[in-house]
A protein has these predicted regions:
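Alpha-helical transmembrane segments and their short interhelical loops
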Residues: 117-192, 241-264
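Short, membrane-interfacial amphipathic segments enriched in basic
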Residues: 10-32, 171, 214-225
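Transmembrane helix segments
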Residues: 60-62, 179-221, 225
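Membrane-interface helix starts
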Residues: 33-52, 240-242, 246
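Junction motif at the cytosolic side of a transmembrane helix
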Residues: 2-13, 235-239, 250-276
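Membrane-interfacial helix-loop-helix junctions in multi-pass membrane proteins
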Residues: 38, 151, 202-258
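Hydrophobic alpha-helical transmembrane segments of multi-pass membrane transport proteins
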Residues: 55, 59-60, 75-146, 175-178, ...
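Transmembrane helix-loop junction
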Residues: 38, 61, 65-66, 100, ...
Length: 276
């Protein structure tokens, strides 16, 4: 009696394995790379904030600089550059693109894959940090042309860009929360409106010492006040103002904790609804 055995199929010589590369780093790189590749194809998502920031930077200097021209050692151009930077990077994120992924059901298909759920958001946010850092360049170049100097040299410039990018990341969480919760492009695009009270109820255009009454009180509770203080400490005064930089980082952290809690909760809700 002859025994019959099933032949073992072995991969042909030179045949490549199609197994999915494992690891959270691969997931993050794939998501962030896709988000970054989409940026040049969607300039309308990133260019308007920069143009608006440059416009108000120039206009505010032209109209308000002479009011502080008699104060020696004070540069209103340097003072106002921090406000322009926040206008340029706040609300800039790939959240509108994520809404399109929701509407096209690409996100639902992505959730069926082994990709880590947190990598979906973190990958997009990594791309946001890179984009925000690049968007600071036109404003910084204009500021330097107009006479702004960083007391910390190259390190001061790097710290300025880092603070701006971290703030952009912290605020972007609100956009992602709205995108995942509603799947509505109009709602996501209106997320920037959340920033306006923070921008105007603070020392955006005059030093905090010049604010009076209830506005001064509100500014004391506004995280943007401390962020502006940290940014301005790099271009006004002398040396590293560690206290102000620490307050700026703390303000970013508070906003970031709130926004990230909201957006990751929205992601869990989206995953749960997709599983039903």
């Amino acid at each position: 009696m002859t025994a019959v055995t099933d032949p073992i199929t072995r991969p042909a010589s030179g045949e490549m394995s199609l197994a999915r590369p494992a690891g959270v780093l691969h997931d993050l790189t794939a998501i962030a790379g896709r988000a970054l590749r989409a940026v040049p194809r969607d300039p309308a998502a990133v260019m308007p904030p920069v143009f608006i920031a440059l416009f108000f930077f120039i206009v505010n200097i032209a109209t308000l600089k002479r009011l502080t021209g008699n104060h020696p050692g004070f540069s209103y151009t340097a003072f106002e550059m921090a406000t322009a930077i926040l206008l340029g990077v706040t609300g800039v994120s790939r959240a509108p693109a994520l809404v399109l992924d929701v509407q096209s059901h690409y996100l639902d298909r992505l959730l069926l894959t082994p990709v880590r759920r947190t990598a979906i958001l973190v990958g997009h946010m990594a791309a946001d940090v890179a984009v925000a850092a690049v968007l600071t360049a036109p404003i910084l170049v204009l500021g330097v042309i107009l006479g702004v100097r960083f007391h910390g040299g190259v390190l001061g410039v790097a710290a300025f860009i880092l603070l701006a990018a971290l703030w952009s990341l912290a605020f972007a969480g609100f956009g992602y929360a709205i995108a995942l919760k509603t799947g509505n492009p109009a709602a996501v695009n209106s997320a920037f409106l959340l920033f306006f009270p923070f921008l105007f109820l603070t020392s955006s255009y005059v030093p905090r010492s010049q604010l009076a009454g209830w506005l001064s009180t509100v500014a004391g509770f506004n995280p943007v006040t401390y962020l502006l203080g940290g940014l301005r400490s790099l271009v006004l005064g002398s040396g590293w103002q560690w206290g102000q930089l620490g307050q700026a980082l703390a303000a970013i952290a508070i906003v970031g904790v709130i926004s990230m809690t909201m957006c990751f909760a929205a992601l869990r809700g989206r995953v749960k609804r997709g599983a039903q």
